Amino acid sequence: MAKYVDGYVIPIEKTKVKAYKKLATLGRKIWMEHGALDYYECVGDALDTKWGLPFKKLCKLKANETVVFAFIVYKSKADRDRINAKAQTDPRMQPKPGKKFVMPFDMKRFSTGGFKAFIST
């Protein structure tokens, strides 16, 4: 059966990667508990490539930034929709009472999308 993948490309300040990792660790726990098949968060390492459009240019990274490439794997698009609805309303994903939550990256610069897998393991 074909799988479904949510993909993310997230420009982020290098000094905020640690805070993002904490958030992503919680996200992984929640998405996996609700039925995701796999969950990856990957931070840029070899971004100066000679082929194609390097992530540095694609994301217009500043000198103090890197990029996170992340993806979550689901059994199907229907499963993805069900799991996302549960995960996004999970109480652990909600801001603590009386505390304002600020994302560790610029929400206007990140990219996301859903993808039908046509080759997978």
What is each residue range found by the language model?
Residues 1-26:
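Long, hydrophobic N-terminal alpha-helical segment
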Residues 3, 26, 30-34, 97:
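N-terminal pre-domain and mature-chain start segments
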Residues 5-12, 51-87, 113:
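Short, well-ordered beta-strand segments in beta-rich or mixed alpha/beta enzyme
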Residues 18, 78-80, 120:
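Residue-level signal for secondary-structure boundary sites
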Residues 19-32, 67-73:
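Generic detector of contiguous secondary-structure segments
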Residues 21-27, 83-90:
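Short amphipathic alpha-helices in soluble, non-transmembrane regions
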Residues 32, 38-63, 89-121:
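Glycine-rich beta-strand-turn "strand-cap" elements at beta-sheet edges
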